[in-house]
Structure formats: structure tokens, C-alpha cells
Curated annotation (Swiss-Prot):
InterPro entries: aa-tRNA-synth_I_cd-bd, aa-tRNA-synth_I_codon-bd_sub2, aa-tRNA-synth_I_CS, aa_tRNA-synth_I_cd-bd_sf, Glu-tRNA-ligase_bac/mito, Glu/Gln-tRNA-synth, Glu/Gln-tRNA-synth_Ib_cat-dom, GluQ/Sye. This is Glutamate--tRNA ligase 1. One of its GO terms (molecular function) is ATP binding. SUPFAM superfamilies: An anticodon-binding domain of class I aminoacyl-tRNA synthetases, Nucleotidylyl transferase. It comes from Ehrlichia canis (strain Jake). A motif ('KMSKS' region) lies at residues 238-242. Transmembrane segments: none annotated. It holds the Pfam family tRNA-synt_1c. CDD domains: GluRS_core (cd00808). It is found in: Cytoplasm.
Length: 469
């Protein structure tokens, strides 16, 4: 494999890392890893009013959580401004750029007139081939774009892309305060970082055509481009601003495992045969740009739930326990004892089968770690009140079992005997046990729970239900 593949992820720290950005980072990382190349991180922080160190840290932490690790040191675009200005001045010296003295008011008026006529607006600067005015008025630096012909490139996903140069204006390179624009900065940084491949969303297609004009003016070889379809909502519509703003940290806080998000993002626009569950090692081995489709991918909450459940279930119980204990302790306000952790550890295998996420799992696990009195829902309270006579018999019979005989066969035998002797359905006896021991009706196998909680804890909970409720 080539060692010359260098990709990059270049987020703007004006918000948290969201799904679209994370997928872009993932695809660039995978392509570099697959080709034994390098994956670089550039923080495009030139918008100082909206950028912050907190958001930079948030983006890097989210990438690290997803196990998307960049090579070397993160580059801050703001530290390269002098280089960007240098290149703009070089274009001026080579007559590839010019000073534009048109005022903002003049340009806005032109835009309004074009809009009224329903025409595409393209600024035609009167200063393109004129000498500078005598007065010291505000100016910007614009690229001298070709007025005819086409700009075309071979996109790695969509094939040949052609844009008429008549649609491309003389873009601003330096603003009136001498700060570089995004389009110039990106080209210079990608060139200086030796970026070989740029994988990004189709919303950048127009930017690519414009950036190629800068590459041509500088006589630099451009990188290869691969534009990936955008992510749509579950109905196939463009994502709303609310959806776009959901950060990776919010998925983390809702109890989604990083492996699930990784797998979910991977399958958004890329496929390998009919595989749905794909490990990181498999993704690195299989990833190719040829596997990226041309149609927009859709959010699919059910698929994310499926993947998260899968990864929760294949993760060992000790690891999952350590993940949910902080959630439980925050919810209850209590430190969970080692004894209670032991109860929960025994019951995790069953609880994991039913869960969607870690937050849900923590909630479903509460009955294992609660002290008496445990929380009991209204349905369970009704059961306890309606079948007091059964609780009395349950307590008497279960009290006669020794700790060492507290096992599945003996417990089942007692439950069947009570059902038979009282002439009630066995499900009623199960309901009574669930109500008093777990405080809810939708718990896993009550026999398994009783074995996990052990003799003393179960009897204390049944006794509380019998005497207090």
C-alpha cells in the first residue's frame, strides 16, 4: 500500500462535533488507515468570535471517544494567517489577483437588482483591469477568475464534475482588514500539509470548483476529492437545524457506546456486501471510496438501537457495570456498595438483553442496588394490596429454606406448591414476587433475580411488602 495517502479533518470550533462531521472524520481516518497513510487534524479557528478552546476540546474528546485518533499535532489555522496573506500577495504580484474597491453598499445594491430580475448574481468588479483610485478607500483582494470555459475535476464518488466558469465569481481572498477568507486558507493549508485526498460532504462541491481556481492560479497540484452524500432525516428530508446540532457528546450522554456510533456512522453511505455489524479492524481492512454510495443516507434510530444493544451484549459485564454505576449513583444520590454491585453483576447478562442504551440499563438495574424500601410502581402496589394473603404464605415458606438450598429447583417447587394449594394461577405468585422484590412487573426471570439477590435480601423485601404496604 502507498505511504503517500494523507487525509485530514478540518472542523470549525463554533459548535460540538455532530454526526455529519464525525462521519467525515471517520471516512478520512479509515481511508488513511486502509492505505497505511496519515490522518491529520486541522482546527479552522479563524472565526475568533464564535470559536472557543472549550469547543476545540469537545471536538477532540469526541473523536478520541470514537477512537478516531489523528497523527501528529493538531494544526490551528489561525496560526497560519501570515502564510495565507503571503500567498495572496504572491497572487497579486503575479497578476492573478487584484484590489477591489467596490463598497459593500454597491455590491448589496447589485444583488438586490439581480434578485428582482430573477438572475444569478455574479459580481463584475470595475477595478479588475483598472488602476487604483487616488483616494484611500477600503479595498479587498479578489482572485482573477476566468470568464469563460469550464472548471472540471474527477470526483472519486460522482465521477466528472464540471462547472461553467461563468458561474464562478472573482472570490475574495483577503478581506478589507487584510484577513484571509476560508477559501484561500483551506487551499494554502491543504497544500502545505501535503494533503493527498479530501473526503467531505456534497455541500462543498461549489467550494471545490472555486478552490480549484486558486490551485490553478498558484500552479499547485490539487488533492483528489471525494464528496459524500449528506445525511437526511428518517423521512428522507434534509436535516433540520435541531438535528444538525445534535452533538456526539449527546449520544454519549444518552448511553450509546462508541462502537455503536462508529458502526452506525460507517454504514451511513458506505457498505460492504450485506454486513451490518462491522468491527473497527474490519472497517480498516475493507474501507474503500468505491464503497461509498451516491444517494443520501438516512438517520435510523432503530438501527442505532440495534447496534447499541449488540455492542452492550458483547461487552463483558464488569466493563458495563463500571459504565452504569456512575449513572446509577448520580440518579440515586448514593454510593453503591460492593455487595449491591455484586447483586447487579450477576443480573447484568439478562438485563443487557433487553436494553437500548446504558441510561436505560441503569434505570432497569435500580432494583438490584436499592436499599429497602425499594421504589415500587403503582401496578406493583396494587398487586401487593390485592394479594396480602399470598405474601404471608410466601414469606413463611421461603423462610424455611436455608441459604445453601436457595436454588432454582427448590424455589420453583415452593412456587408451584403455593399455586396449587391456593388454587391460583402460577402467574399470580410470580406477580407477587416481582412486585415485592423488584417493585415492577416487567422484570426479567424472577427466579434468577431471587438467586442473584440471595436469601436474606429477598426475604427482607417480601417482609417489607407484607408489613408496610
Amino acid at each position: 500500500m502507498s505511504h503517500d495517502v494523507i487525509t485530514r479533518f478540518a472542523p470549525s470550533p463554533t459548535g460540538h462535533l455532530h454526526l455529519g462531521g464525525a462521519r467525515t472524520a471517520l471516512f478520512n481516518w479509515l481511508y488513511a488507515k486502509h492505505n497505511n497513510g496519515k490522518f491529520l487534524l486541522r482546527i479552522e479557528d479563524t472565526d475568533k468570535k464564535r470559536s472557543s478552546q472549550e469547543l476545540i476540546d469537545s471536538i477532540i474528546n469526541a473523536m478520541s471517544w470514537l477512537k478516531i485518533h489523528y497523527d501528529g499535532k493538531a494544526v490551528l489555522q489561525s496560526e497560519n494567517i501570515s502564510r495565507h496573506v503571503e500567498i495572496a500577495n504572491q497572487l497579486m504580484l503575479n497578476n492573478k489577483a487584484y484590489y477591489c474597491y467596490c463598497s459593500e453598499e454597491e455590491i448589496n445594491k447589485e444583488k438586490e437588482e439581480s434578485a428582482k430580475k430573477g438572475l444569478y448574481y455574479k459580481h463584475n468588479c470595475i477595478w479588475k483591469n483598472k488602476s487604483a483610485p487616488n483616494s484611500n478607500i477600503t479595498r479587498v483582494v479578489r482572485l482573477k477568475s476566468p470568464t469563460d470555459g469550464v472548471t472540471s475535476f474527477d470526483d472519486e464518488v460522482y465521477g466528472n464534475i464540471t462547472v461553467n466558469n461563468s458561474q464562478l465569481d472573482d472570490m475574495i481572498l483577503l478581506r478589507s482588514d487584510n484577513t484571509p477568507t476560508y477559501l484561500l486558507s483551506v487551499v494554502v493549508d491543504d497544500h502545505d500539509m501535503n494533503i493527498s485526498h479530501i473526503i467531505r460532504g456534497t455541500d462543498h462541491l461549489t467550494n471545490t470548483a472555486r478552490q480549484l481556481l486558486i490551485y490553478n492560479a498558484l500552479e499547485w497540484d490539487p488533492p483528489k476529492f471525494a464528496h459524500i452524500p449528506l445525511i437526511h432525516d428518517e423521512n428522507g428530508n434534509k436535516l433540520s437545524k435541531r438535528h444538525q446540532a445534535i452533538g456526539i457528546h449527546e449520544y454519549k450522554n444518552s448511553g450509546i457506546l462508541p462502537e455503536a456510533i462508529f458502526n452506525y456512522l460507517l454504514r451511513m453511505g458506505w457498505s460492504h456486501e450485506n454486513d451490518e455489524v462491522i468491527t473497527i479492524d474490519q472497517a480498516i481492512r475493507w474501507f474503500s471510496i468505491e464503497g461509498i454510495g451516491q444517494s443520501p443516507s438516512r438517520l435510523d434510530s432503530k438501527k442505532l438501537e440495534f447496534l447499541n444493544n449488540h455492542y452492550i451484549n458483547i461487552t463483558d459485564n464488569e466493563t458495563i457495570l463500571n459504565m452504569i454505576i456512575p449513572i446509577i449513583e448520580e440518579k440515586t444520590g448514593h454510593i453503591i456498595t460492593d455487595v449491591k454491585k455484586g447483586y447487579l453483576l450477576k443480573g447484568l447478562s439478562e438485563l443487557k438483553k433487553r436494553t437500548k442504551n446504558l441510561v436505560n440499563l441503569a434505570k432497569e438495574s435500580l432494583f438490584y442496588v436499592e436499599d429497602i424500601p425499594i421504589s415500587i410502581d403503582q401496578e406493583s402496589i396494587t398487586v401487593i394490596k390485592d394479594y396480602k394473603h399470598i405474601f404471608s404464605i410466601l414469606y413463611d415458606n421461603l423462610s424455611k429454606i436455608s441459604e445453601k438450598d436457595w436454588n432454582h429447583n427448590i424455589l420453583m417447587s415452593i412456587i408451584k406448591d403455593i399455586s396449587c394449594n391456593l388454587e391460583v394461577k402460577i402467574s399470580i405468585v410470580y406477580h407477587c414476587l416481582r412486585a415485592s422484590i423488584t417493585g415492577r412487573m416487567n422484570a426479567p426471570s424472577i427466579i434468577e433475580i431471587m438467586i442473584n439477590l440471595q436469601h436474606k435480601e429477598c426475604l427482607q423485601r417480601i417482609k417489607y411488602a407484607l408489613d408496610v404496604i
